[in-house]
């Protein structure tokens, strides 16, 4: 008989019981998000989903994303209840810009040591995000990987699939000079620019838990979940048929994201004076002495989504968006780009 102790998976740092406890806790979360097209529940090897009825030529649209180093801030603040909303938002907002209705979502959660309470908070947030987007949480992977992550640190990735009618795909090809650009407000930095944000906090030596801006704690402003624009935008598309292009303003800000949906020869002229920049961005700029152009190249500066419609559809589009609970405004228009000109021109940039 060997005197060597009998090793288990738990001795190696993997707690199967904790994983099973998590699955039990999140089953009700997934159930709340279920769409009629989804077949079966959590726990199968693969998730099955029918194409919704009514599509003539359905095209599937897929996307994947994470939440960047906003996750580090969440870990530092021990605030895990809304980061799942961020994860869903980053994926579904990318899908809706081509006119797609999100169908289902999966997540990947990797950690060095599984904390069931933390993971359950994260997945509950993912469920809340799925409800806001109208898509089903159909499964995911929870990987406990000792030696790969420090302690209970974790990483997140999301995956989403949506569907759009082939004839109704929005791809920016019809954008023309004279078209109007509408904007929808962000809730804050959303899920982008957090490496710069964290550097600013570090260099400024700021105690973000004691700072208030406009009567709100700075931590609340920095951790505000990314807005999910799916339902208002699908309503806009359905009721007006007027949307020519949409840009989700993520990493790269207005300067890098609007060109992704512009045809060659088109230039977006954006009036920076058309909206009041939220105080959190002014605080970040001041504390980090960040150049104005850099602000717009890294952060959304208060704009989460840009929508292109013909001038004759502006009032109808604004009306539908307001009815959906949004606060849209006209942010600029499309011009013909001069030879060698940038595809986005920012007007009325304040001197810094």
UniProtKB/Swiss-Prot annotation:
Top-level taxon of origin: Bacteria
Enzyme class: ligase
Compartmental location: Cytoplasm
InterPro entries listed in its UniProt record: PurM-like_C_dom, PurM-like_C_sf, PurM-like_N, PurM-like_N_sf, PurM_cligase
One Pfam family matching this protein: AIRS_C
Pathway(s) where this gene product acts: Purine metabolism; IMP biosynthesis via de novo pathway; 5-amino-1-(5-phospho-D-ribosyl)imidazole from N(2)-formyl-N(1)-(5-phospho-D-ribosyl)glycinamide: step 2/2
Enzymatic reactions: 2-formamido-N(1)-(5-O-phospho-beta-D-ribosyl)acetamidine + ATP = 5-amino-1-(5-phospho-beta-D-ribosyl)imidazole + ADP + phosphate + H(+)
Listed EC numbers: 6.3.3.1
GO cellular component, one term: cytosol
UniProt xrefs under HAMAP family: AIRS
Family: Belongs to the AIR synthase family.
Record protein name field: Phosphoribosylformylglycinamidine cyclo-ligase
Organism: Pseudomonas savastanoi pv. phaseolicola (strain 1448A / Race 6) (Pseudomonas syringae pv. phaseolicola (strain 1448A / Race 6))
